[in-house]
């Protein structure tokens, strides 16, 4: 959620930032609604003060004093009725909060203006693309031919956008998760967490998924939602807390299943493992101070890139433009891996600095030792990485002419010494 005080004091800049996000100016409407809310709040405070004064006088008067006592009683009763009416008006005046809840984060000054992904900015590349590679198969062709990846029978169980992995591909999935967790905990100092994957609506609201993206998640019949990313569970670990400054940055990593309805993705990536309803992902989250969040963003992006470097995969890092950024983010890097079977780059990681946007929603603060003042933390998240898309990249980049898959060197020990994935044999 955005800072209403900042909006009030920077109306022109606020509207300009909204235009960069392709949203109509809202400053005047917010000022009107905010003014109405503040007026009611001030009246409530005035009446509460009057009630306190009259109640104190009433307590010092003999009940047998007659008209003066009865008059004060009537005054207190009238004040209580007026307060009840004003508080009801305040509770019913939800338009301001509803409007603020639909507004995305303000883009950082370093974010380029742009309409869509075609206007994202290239930051760096790693490795080289073999443009002469011919007859490279896509991952689902390889997996099905090896009889280690099943879509047809799985569709009978769960429908479209699900997959079953078998044998050495199931083992590769487990190996990748262990490898990623080892790198992030051992080399980058993230604390491994095993969080819930069922959360309440308020947790989804805190992280920015609700109310705007309600139709993109799976809801249970008893008030829970399946997480679309472990970011939801991890950032909420500091909801409604005040963290000692010396405990920051708080770096967390989790490996969880993730669930997405893929609403609005009809017809896109209908084959293969690129866009599934259920997938596994290693997620990074950092809680830090406003002064350190930019450096932390680079640190986390480096952690994600390191996984791809160790796997020997070619990728490029893009700075997203204003029209392609996520709702809660003020600055995002996307890491795109090269897929020779598709002959294109595909997003494999997203690394975002959300500033105090999520912290304001979930009331997450920190304070310096010995101080009574508190400040909103900054929250950051990064894919570290999605297991399925990483497997896609390995299958397409490490495929051999006979259809087998060479296991990347860094994963051989995690695969029990296996160096090549071949067709399943019963």
Curated annotation (Swiss-Prot):
Kindly state a single biological-process term from the GO annotations of this entry: seryl-tRNA aminoacylation
Report the catalytic activity.
tRNA(Ser) + L-serine + ATP = L-seryl-tRNA(Ser) + AMP + diphosphate + H(+); tRNA(Sec) + L-serine + ATP = L-seryl-tRNA(Sec) + AMP + diphosphate + H(+)
Q: Which GO CC terms are listed, alphabetically? A: cytoplasm
Functional pathway: Aminoacyl-tRNA biosynthesis; selenocysteinyl-tRNA(Sec) biosynthesis; L-seryl-tRNA(Sec) from L-serine and tRNA(Sec): step 1/1
* Entry function: Catalyzes the attachment of serine to tRNA(Ser). Is also able to aminoacylate tRNA(Sec) with serine, to form the misacylated tRNA L-seryl-tRNA(Sec), which will be further converted into selenocysteinyl-tRNA(Sec).
Give the family this protein belongs to, as stated in its UniProt record: Belongs to the class-II aminoacyl-tRNA synthetase family. Type-1 seryl-tRNA synthetase subfamily.
Identify the residues that bind ATP: 260-262, 347-350
Q: What is its EC number?
A: 6.1.1.11
- Gene Ontology molecular function terms on file: ATP binding; serine-tRNA ligase activity
> What name does UniProt use for this protein?
Serine--tRNA ligase
Question: Which UniProt keywords are listed?
Answer: Aminoacyl-tRNA synthetase, ATP-binding, Cytoplasm, Ligase, Nucleotide-binding, Protein biosynthesis
Q: Which HAMAP family match?
A: Ser_tRNA_synth_type1 (MF_00176)
Matching CDD domains: SerRS_core (cd00770)
Provide the binding site for L-serine.
229-231, 283, 383
Q: Which pairs of Cys residues are joined through disulfide bonds in the record?
A: none
**Subunit field text:** Homodimer. The tRNA molecule binds across the dimer.
Record text about domains:
Consists of two distinct domains, a catalytic core and a N-terminal extension that is involved in tRNA binding.
Gene name for this UniProt entry: serS
From the Swiss-Prot or TrEMBL record, state where the protein is found.
Answer: Cytoplasm
Q: What class of enzyme is it?
A: ligase
């Amino acid at each position: 959620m955005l800072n209403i005080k900042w909006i009030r004091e920077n109306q022109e800049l606020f509207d300009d930032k909204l235009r960069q996000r392709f949203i109509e100016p809202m400053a005047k409407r917010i000022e009107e609604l905010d003014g109405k809310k503040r007026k009611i709040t001030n009246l409530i405070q005035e009446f509460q003060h009057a009630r306190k004064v009259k109640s104190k006088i009433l307590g010092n008067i003999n009940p047998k004093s007659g008209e003066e006592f009865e008059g004060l009683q009537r005054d207190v009763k009238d004040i209580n009725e007026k307060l009840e009416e004003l508080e009801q008006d305040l509770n019913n005046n939800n338009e301001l909060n509803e409007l603020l809840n639909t507004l995305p984060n303000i883009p950082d000054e370093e974010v380029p203006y742009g309409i869509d992904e075609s206007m994202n900015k290239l930051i760096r590349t790693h490795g080289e693309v073999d443009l002469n590679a011919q007859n490279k198969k896509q991952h689902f062709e390889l997996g099905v031919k090896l009889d280690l990846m099943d879509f047809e029978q799985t569709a009978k169980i769960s429908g479209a956008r699900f997959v079953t992995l078998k044998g050495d591909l199931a083992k590769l999935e487990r190996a990748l998760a262990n490898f990623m967790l080892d790198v992030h905990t051992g080399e980058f100092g993230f604390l491994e967490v095993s969080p819930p994957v069922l959360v309440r609506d308020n947790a989804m609201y805190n992280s920015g998924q609700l109310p705007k993206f309600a139709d993109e998640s799976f809801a249970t019949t008893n008030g829970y939602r399946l997480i679309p990313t472990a970011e939801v569970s991890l950032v909420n670990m500091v909801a409604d807390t005040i963290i000692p400054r010396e405990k920051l940055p708080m770096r967390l990593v989790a490996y969880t299943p993730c669930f997405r309805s893929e609403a609005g993705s009809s017809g896109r990536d209908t084959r293969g493992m690129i866009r599934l309803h259920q997938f596994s992902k290693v997620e990074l989250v950092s809680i830090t101070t406003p002064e350190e969040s930019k450096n932390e963003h680079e640190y986390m992006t480096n952690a994600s890139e390191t996984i791809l470097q160790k796997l020997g995969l070619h990728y490029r890092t893009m700075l997203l433009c204003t029209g392609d950024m996520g709702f809660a983010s003020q600055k995002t890097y996307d890491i795109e891996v090269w897929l020779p079977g598709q002959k294109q780059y595909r997003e494999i990681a997203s690394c975002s600095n959300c500033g105090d946007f999520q912290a304001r929603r979930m009331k997450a603060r920190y304070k310096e030792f010995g101080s009574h003042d508190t400040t909103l933390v900054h929250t950051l998240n990064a894919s570290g990485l999605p297991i399925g898309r990483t497997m896609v990249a390995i299958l397409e980049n490490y495929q051999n002419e006979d259809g087998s898959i060479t296991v990347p060197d860094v994963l051989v020990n995690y695969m029990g010494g296996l160096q090549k994935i071949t067709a399943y044999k019963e």
